């Protein structure tokens, strides 16, 4: 060491270098695909996801004793991650916390979207069900039906996955209070005929299990749609391009009701391009990313 070199400055210099090394390592980790999403799952489901790790350049998470790889959004068992092209990605996206403007597509983009709809109808996408099945302990119909519960939500009896019991209890309590102070909400709830939950079925037109088949989704079904569109696929029988249907012509859930569900971990299908305005899906990992 040079005579008179201050030890404090040396320590500060070494500390700064170490901090830069940590920051650079963190940057590299965050830059790898899937890091944000894997961490969101771990934050949203701490009772099921034991740990996350970088292994062989891939973000992974562990449920019980099994590791699942990000695998370009497919979330595959470690032994199958090289086959990611055989499967569709699990829906993970930037969810808007306010009602987004309608999509405005030029003719080229519109043509691509029309072709995508045709392609999906001809060759339905198929997700690997292993991750959600293990996460929810609902890999088969029999296993799923051992995990569902019947409960009351806003005056209706609904069957859902047991993980939804607490958040839906809070939803019901908040809606009960809201209907006393908000006439629009009271009228909306009075206009419902049922709330549907668990239903072991596949997404319409695909080979993938619906989130209803895990008991993770509920549909608020009205007595009448009043001539409005609630679902993009139904709208296609009336309009050429479903995404152009203005909000005024869609059956809509009042914003205060949507906010109650969102506060408790649910995303609303009314904010999707492929809209489903009656549909709420328990996706706390998506809301975690939206609020980062």
Where are these regions (language model features)?
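Active-site acidic/histidine clusters and adjacent loop/turn architecture
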Residues: 119-190
């Amino acid at each position: 060491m040079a005579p008179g070199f201050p030890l404090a400055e040396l320590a500060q210099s070494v500390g700064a270098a170490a901090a830069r090394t940590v920051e650079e390592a963190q940057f590299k980790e965050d830059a790898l695909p899937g890091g944000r999403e894997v961490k969101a799952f771990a934050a949203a489901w701490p009772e099921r996801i034991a740990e996350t790790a970088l292994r062989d350049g891939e973000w992974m998470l562990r449920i019980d004793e099994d590791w699942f790889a990000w695998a370009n959004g497919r979330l595959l068992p470690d032994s199958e991650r090289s086959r990611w092209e055989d499967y569709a990605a699990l829906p993970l996206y930037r969810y808007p916390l306010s009602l987004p403007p309608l999509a405005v597509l030029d003719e080229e983009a519109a043509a691509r979207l029309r072709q995508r709809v045709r392609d999906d109808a001809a060759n339905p996408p198929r997700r690997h069900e292993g991750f959600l099945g293990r996460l929810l302990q609902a890999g088969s119909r029999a296993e799923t039906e051992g995990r569902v519960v019947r409960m009351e939500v806003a005056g209706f009896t609904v069957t859902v996955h047991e993980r939804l019991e607490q958040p839906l209890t809070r939803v019901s309590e908040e809606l009960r209070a809201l209907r006393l102070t908000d006439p629009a909400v009271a009228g909306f709830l009075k206009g419902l005929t049922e709330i549907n939950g668990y239903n072991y079925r596949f997404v319409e037109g695909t080979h993938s299990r619906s989130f209803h088949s895990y008991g993770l989704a509920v549909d608020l079904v009205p007595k009448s749609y009043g001539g409005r569109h609630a679902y993009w696929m139904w709208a296609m029988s009336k309009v050429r391009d479903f995404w152009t249907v203005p909000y005024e012509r869609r059956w809509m859930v009042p914003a205060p009701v949507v906010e109650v569900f969102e506060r408790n971990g649910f995303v609303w299908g009314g904010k999707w391009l492929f809209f489903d305005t009656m549909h709420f899906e328990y996706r706390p990992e998506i809301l975690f990313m939206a609020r980062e």
